[in-house]
Regions:
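N-terminal "arm"/small-domain region of PLP-dependent enzymes with the aminotransferase-like
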Residues: 1-49, 174
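Conserved beta-strand elements of the Class I
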Residues: 21, 74, 94-96
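Short glycine-rich anion-binding loops that position phosphate/pyrophosphate groups of nucleotides
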Residues: 26-29, 79-80, 102, 148-152, ...
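PLP-dependent aminotransferase class I/II
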Residues: 31-33, 54, 202-223
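Short loop-beta-helix segment that forms the pyridoxal 5′-phosphate
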Residues: 51, 63-85
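PLP-dependent aminotransferase-like
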Residues: 88-146
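Active-site pre-lysine segment of PLP-dependent enzymes
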Residues: 110, 127-140, 152-176, 180-215
Length: 223
């Protein structure tokens, strides 16, 4: 399987001889932060060595930033990498996603032969996730993906609804995966994160440096 993630700007340049205006990836237009560029330059002398496979220093700093134990954090090559790793580790037989949503949830699920059920969001409800989504979660659904805010609709489910979805998942023996890669774009993002629900035990939260920090080429995400 040839997996393609992000806009294929190199293919466009090769075919048309110019760079595209790429609106496919939703990366911050502010570009790579200067501090990150300096850190990358400073780290170049160590590029002849393999990095720490457990990302100990990074996980420790992420733990301080997120307010969660470092033991609960797993780093990967972007959130997309972690989506596939999670699916390959759990090997769900049946999963539920909204439609429309980020396409790589279904791609990852189908790579292990999982049956993907789609809960179609209604145009007359402005493509919002409502409590009707809970009714689609039932025993036999092993995994649910919820994008917060949803890509591509931009809709955000209220935190009480996320908690309702999580408890429904717990009752059905289902793992809930909440993708918060775009959440930090919101000025009040701290009011909407599902981090406070991690104690429930059946929740995984995905985050990445790709979007907000303009670091798509660095490939860095965490769960």
């Amino acid at each position: 399987m040839q997996l393609v993630h992000g806009g294929d700007w190199a293919g466009y340049r090769a075919e048309f001889g110019r760079d595209p205006l790429d609106f496919s990836a939703n990366v911050s237009p502010l570009g790579l932060p200067e501090g990150v560029a300096r850190a990358i330059t400073a780290a170049l002398p160590t590029a002849d060595r393999y990095p720490d496979p457990l990302c100990r220093e990074l996980r420790a700093k992420l733990a301080l930033h997120e307010g969660v134990p470092a033991e609960q954090i797993l780093c990967g090559n972007g959130a997309a990498d972690l989506i596939f790793r999670l699916v390959w580790a759990k090997k769900p037989r049946r999963a539920l996603v909204t439609a429309p949503t980020f396409a790589e949830y279904a791609t990852a699920l189908e790579s292990v032969g999982c049956t993907v059920e789609r809960f179609f969001l209604r145009e007359q409800e402005d493509f919002a996730v409502t409590d009707a989504f809970c009714a689609a979660i039932r025993p036999g659904v092993d995994m649910v993906f919820l994008c917060q805010p949803n890509n591509p609709t931009g809709q955000l489910a209220a935190l009480p609804l996320v908690e309702q979805i999580l408890r429904r998942c717990a009752a059905c023996g289902t793992l809930l995966v909440v993708d918060e890669c775009f959440l930090d774009f919101l000025p009040d993002h701290a009011l909407h994160t599902a981090k406070g629900l991690l104690g429930e035990g059946n929740l995984v939260i995905l985050k990445a440096f790709t979007k907000l920090y303009g670091m798509a080429g660095v490939r860095l995400g965490y769960a």
